[in-house]
């Protein structure tokens, strides 16, 4: 919260019981280590931690009060305490209440791949005209989403909120907090398919929960080239973005410039935009087209939209280019992976004009019964792309090595692969590093930088 709230207001918002009143709270923190004077401390509970153990510390450091699902033995004087059944759920209710104080364009983004990229692109565009709040990094779960909403200030004129999920009901739950005026789905793929009936129809159903909280008069923005999203017939204004002729926001004249990015033309009902996208990958056209669609819908000028797309910057380990001595380049895309995203980035690597192209690939998780086949399919794709070297790491990557041919190595762990990585990362090599987040391939990037 950046607008001061009383303990009684907070208690009413979360449906809690005010055990003891105190001063006004000005901010929310879930980490006792970064408490500022006047904070509301929300002690979260996880498998290996319980924030209730740090309530006294947080209050003594200056927090105005706290939520608590466990009754404290002693109530410190001058501090407010609000009893709730579940602190995480209460945090979500507080965020939903606080969001209601802001009558601004609220963009909610979900999809199987490209959520963070699209969120960053939309924020880059909208920031050319509005003071825009965006989700930091990919804090897109039941804790990150309310924390983002609680960062809203009076000065904000728009917000772009990224929401992820791996089970049914999660997008719906976050949607009750966000209550979007614009709902965006980037695509439907196999990410977390093992938890979603094992089918892409299940993934579509889960992602479509975003529309349940779309506000009256709201806008849906979809990937118009996605076969499953193309089946949706929604009862509100919808803009489809892509290369297909039936798209409302159509991309043409695509010119890929390797790792330096690409250019394209985006045409809407009102205008035509010549765009320069400063990040590699053909998939970037969808984020750019969605930026055009939403920017135009919200009244941005043509110049603001073009400038915003050009201002896009990748975040974290997402298509981050690292230039190393000896004309070596690392394409750091190791934050996460699913079959569609891995295939796209491998095609990008294959099109790179470098003497040597190398891929370091790790397991893709949450694929359920499709896991083995998905890794085998990546191996078959590698045969088409004819890269000079592939290093596969992890249990599931064994299936890739059963179908891939050529200069292909397999290791069970990152540590086992280090010697080969150093040897193969020769001058003039462009290397792609990609795996699911749990593989911790940031270690690979560090090793390659040492080389």
Residue ranges and their predicted role:
Residues 12, 90-224, 228-237, 423, ...:
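Phosphate-binding loop of NTP-binding sites
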Residues 10, 39, 58, 94, ...:
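Residue-level signal for inorganic ion chemistry
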Residues 19-28, 89-92, 140-143, 163-168, ...:
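Short gly/ser/thr-rich secondary-structure transition/capping motifs
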Residues 418-424:
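Short amphipathic alpha-helix with an adjacent loop that forms part of the alpha/beta core around
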Residues 1-93, 350-354, 380-394, 398, ...:
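N-terminal leader/targeting and accessory segments in enzymes
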Residues 109, 316-320, 438-446:
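ATP-dependent carboxylate/acyl-activation modules
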Residues 46-49, 314-317, 334-406, 410, ...:
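Active-site beta-alpha connecting loops in nucleotide-dependent enzymes
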Residues 72-77, 184-329, 354-355, 380-384, ...:
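Acidic, Mg2+-coordinating active-site environments of NTP-dependent enzymes
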């Amino acid at each position: 919260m950046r607008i001061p709230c009383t303990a009684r207001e907070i208690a009413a918002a979360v449906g809690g019981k005010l055990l003891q009143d105190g001063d006004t709270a000005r901010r929310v923190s879930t980490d006792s280590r970064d408490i500022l004077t006047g904070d509301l401390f929300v002690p979260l509970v996880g498998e290996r931690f319980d924030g209730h153990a740090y309530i006294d510390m947080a209050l003594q450091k200056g927090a105005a009060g706290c939520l608590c699902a466990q009754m404290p033995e002693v109530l410190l004087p001058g501090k407010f305490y609000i009893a709730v059944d579940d602190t995480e759920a209460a945090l979500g209710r507080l965020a939903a209440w606080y969001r209601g104080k802001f009558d601004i364009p609220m963009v909610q983004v979900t999809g199987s791949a490209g959520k963070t990229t699209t969120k960053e692109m939309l924020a880059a565009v909208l920031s050319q005209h509005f003071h825009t709040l965006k989700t930091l990094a990919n804090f897109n779960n039941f804790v990150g989403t309310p924390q983002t909403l609680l960062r809203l200030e009076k000065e904000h004129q728009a917000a772009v909120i990224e929401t992820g999920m791996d089970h049914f009901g999660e997008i719906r739950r976050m949607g009750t907090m966000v209550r979007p005026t614009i709902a965006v789905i980037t695509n439907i793929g196999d990410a977390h398919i093992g938890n979603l009936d094992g089918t892409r129809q299940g993934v579509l159903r889960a992602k479509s929960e975003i529309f349940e909280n779309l506000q009256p008069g709201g806008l849906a923005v979809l990937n118009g080239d996605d076969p499953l999203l193309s089946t949706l017939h929604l009862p509100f204004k919808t803009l489809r973005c892509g290369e297909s002729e039936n798209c409302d926001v159509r991309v043409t004249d695509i010119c890929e410039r390797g790792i330096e990015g690409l250019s394209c033309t985006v045409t809407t009902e009102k205008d035509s935009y010549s765009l320069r996208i400063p990040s590699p990958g053909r998939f970037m056209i969808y984020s750019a087209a969605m930026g055009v669609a939403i920017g135009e819908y919200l009244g941005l000028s043509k110049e603001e939209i073009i400038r915003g797309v050009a201002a896009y910057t990748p975040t974290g380990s997402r298509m981050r280019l690292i230039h190393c001595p000896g004309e070596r380049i690392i394409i750091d895309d190791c934050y996460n992976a699913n079959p569609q995203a891995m295939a796209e980035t491998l095609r990008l690597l294959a099109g790179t004009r470098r003497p040597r192209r190398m891929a370091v690939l790790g397991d893709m998780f949450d694929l359920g019964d499709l896991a083995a086949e998905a890794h085998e399919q990546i191996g078959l794709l590698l045969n088409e792309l004819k890269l000079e070297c592939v290093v596969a790491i992890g249990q599931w990557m064994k299936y890739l090595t059963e179908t891939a041919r050529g200069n292909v190595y397999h290791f069970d762990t990152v540590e086992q692969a280090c010697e080969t990585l150093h040897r193969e990362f020769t001058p003039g090599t462009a290397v792609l590093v990609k795996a699911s987040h749990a593989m911790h391939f940031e270690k690979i990037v560090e090793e390659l930088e040492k080389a």
